Amino acid sequence: PDIGRGLQGTTPGLSVVIPSGEIGSDPTIKVRGQIGSIDGSSTPLILLDNVEIPSIQMVNPDDVESITVLKDAASASIYGAKAAFGVVLITSKKGAKSEKVEVSYSGNFSWQNISKKMEMARVDGIQYRIDALKRAKGTLYGAFWYVDETSLERAKEWDKTWGGKLGVNDPFVYGRDWYVDASNRKFSIRTFDPYDYMIREWAPSQTHNISLSGRSGKTVFNVGLGYLDQNGLMKLAKHDDFRRWNGSIRLSTEINKYITARAGANYSKRNKRYAYATNSTTADPWLYLYRWDSTYPIGYDENGNEMRSPASEIHQANTANKENNYLSFNVGATLQITKDWKFDIDYTYAGEDQIWKKNGTKFTAADTWTSPVKRLDGNGNQIYVNNMGEVVSAGTEGAMPAYGLSYRQYTADGANPDHIRREVTNAKRHTLNITTDYNWQIN
């Protein structure tokens, strides 16, 4: 979807790495693997028609005529300290070579899926932990939800009876899927795969690029437009997508044999929407996706309430919106003083705005992190259930006191409902480049 990914593997010494699967993320570009600081935050200078741009995503792929990578010390001598870690020179198309107007279009529709699914251990994972517990001379393991040898045996029985038969919308039933011991500790014997709850099997994307170029006498022009629409893999988010609009115009005319004038403009808008739950439970939901073992419940309790989990928080989270706008104008001229001596002057104005809206969220869920509560009937009497979760009388064989999860509202760091945050960053730059070239050949 962008030039950076297209550069992968094309040039020796050029490393282009996609840092994450996050939609809309910029590729990390390194020339000869150079690192300029402890955190490795050094990147080459990116120039579009000799105009610095902050991101390679701002360039419409169909507008590119050529790309040159400067890797040696010569790049710094020409472009200064900013080019200490190399230069990526992008030259755009200038216009048609013949007296006509040319229109080109390219587009594609594609589907993305996760590159590798991390398989969660089920009952065998519980067995592994119990074996480790025995070697450590322990008898109980867990936090919020526990496992011991008794729960392991019950989990094995659950897997024989219910394994592969319950879906993501089937409730978490007391007696069948979990129980409470005499010390008021919760034990889950049902196993969950968080992948099924949080990640889409596939996500669509589309790109469209159109280019218009032409020539009239000694004047050439090129107009390019591009659009990218990419959906993320987060299943439960209200919005998880990235959109990019690019536009450019180039105009050049030869006034006489000594002077050539040029002008151009670039526009880029990038918009990313995502569930504002990045720090909703002291860490990223993607960490909690695999932090807990497979016995930690996800989905709904038997009252139809969402249970507290990274999936529930992503589902309920308000949508954050991150927007980047970039606009530049440039004018310039080339003076051909003699056949071997030319003089270039270019002026560029560039402005970039970043607007980041983050609306806090108040979460409501059955709390899987706190102590269970007794289930009582309308008269305040204890309810009893069997190992299928069915309500039975207290004297029935196998009857056990029924428990449930408390239903409450809560907030956490990073998604607090008491704020509606709007961050605006503006960067304006005026650049004047004056260069001269003289070719002198000695025989």
Predicted regions and their residues:
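Short, solvent-exposed loop/turn segments enriched in Ser/Thr/Gly
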Residues: 3, 326-328
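Short, small/polar-rich motifs associated with maturation and membrane association
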Residues: 1-247, 260-262
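Flexible glycine-rich, low-complexity coil/linker segments exposed to the extracellular/periplasmic environment
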Residues: 121, 130-194, 290-313, 372-425
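Residue-level preference for non-acidic, small/hydrophobic
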Residues: 105, 223, 331, 434-436
